[in-house]
Amino acid sequence: MLPEAAAMPRARLMERIPAYWRVPLLRLAGAWLALIALFFADWRDMAGQWWDSSTYNHILLIPPIIGWLVSQRLAAVLRLVPAGWWPGLVVFAGAAFLWMLGDFAGLSIARQLAAVVMLQGAFLALMGPRVAAAMLFPLFYMLFLVPAGDELIPFLQTLTAKITMVLLGLSHVPAIIDGVFITTPAGYFEVAEACSGVKFLIAMIAYGTLVSNVCFRSWPRRIAFMAVCLVTPIFANGVRAWGTIWIAGIRGIEFASSFDHVFYGWIFFAIVMALVMAAGWKFFDRAIDDPMIDIDKVQQSWLVDRLEPLRLGQNAALAALAGLVVLFVGWGSMANAMRAAVPTAIDVPDVPGWHLASDGARYPWMPLHTGADRRLILRYTDGSGSSVDVSYALYDAQMEGKEAGGFGQGALPMGSRWAWESDGPAFADGKSDVVQAPGPVHRLAVTRYRTGDLLTGSNAKLKLVNITDRLLLRSRPTAVLILSAEEGQAAPAPDLIHRFEAAIGPVPAWMDRMASVR
């Protein structure tokens, strides 16, 4: 192929782009590439989740979908004139600040959301409100690049279990529910995290949002279709769980498990999605040749007319974007370099009336404290032979990979056979959970976090204090204490933990002595 022939398509492409668009596009491309490079770790983590996690595999389709959405609007948008716009810098600054807070709190989802919103803010700052209005839906759809949804798993597990119980009752299958565990004559079943239905739900939300924009014009129809896309996967997952248990009663658990993975995993939800699409088909009110945007409305919009005068030179906007990045990344780097002093070792504390014992748990329980600088796990037994387990961890800082209250950390370790059953009885300044392992074995766990003068069972309160410390460039250690007891001992688990707390004295002082900070 001759060099001249290879250059022809590029030349034709440039001819299609008006001259007044070429430099702004280069500025935008440069800004986006620089942001992706600077926050590459977050984009790499997102891409890793898209590829490795079946919950987020559907996001691999989002970038080409966004490209297609842009292509459908491009010819009309090129009729507009891009211009710098200073309110876009406010959006960008907010996103950069959110990224820094997410970095301080070790919240990857906050950093990843911020990385996406920074691209949107840069677009606003460099292209202006009129171009942004024309590209509003593709810009909004970029939010689906953020792998979010795992936070819904506990709620969806509980909801699926309740739907399953209703369906079992309607089908006259006797069953007993205990949290997310269901016992029937066929066996003992758990609505596990993988069976929560979160994969189908978040994929359906992304799909429904796309269809609502592309296939509908009226907002009532869009809202109705989105409602169907929210309700249907939740109910369908309940049907899936019920069907698995019902089949287990006829053919056995092993057959039901295989059937679940093959039919429900690959076929059932495809059928449900097709049925939702078929149900909505006759209500589509956008003709196939309708333009995706009415560019005349965008040009005549009174709202955009009021916003557009807030202009800023594009070079000035680009410089301001760079300055904001330097400010927040530099601030975060200084905070990340700070570490609190922690003891070289933690002494095993004596507890009056209790003595150390070897592990005698009916089912192994090992809390997870990833990234902790010091940790202890001990079992104390009283004169009656009843035991309380103590898990203590100390961190010199809170950040990604060192999160006292991070996902899958603490009393319900990620990847274990333990599952959350219900909230436990109230304990002062603590979070109380009943967890369950196969057997079943029931265990009460009371979690408390300590940093500075704060003692709480709330992960949110801990995060807020940790974030404040980082904002003020203040370093303080963070400790987590979990007191736990199995049910089925000489006394109920809550009574055992209360007795143990009475023996150790004030919990804050006990935690501080172990951390050597008082």
Task: List each language-model region with its residue ranges.
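Hydrophobic N-terminal alpha-helices or hydrophobic patches in metabolic proteins across all domains
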Residues: L2-R518
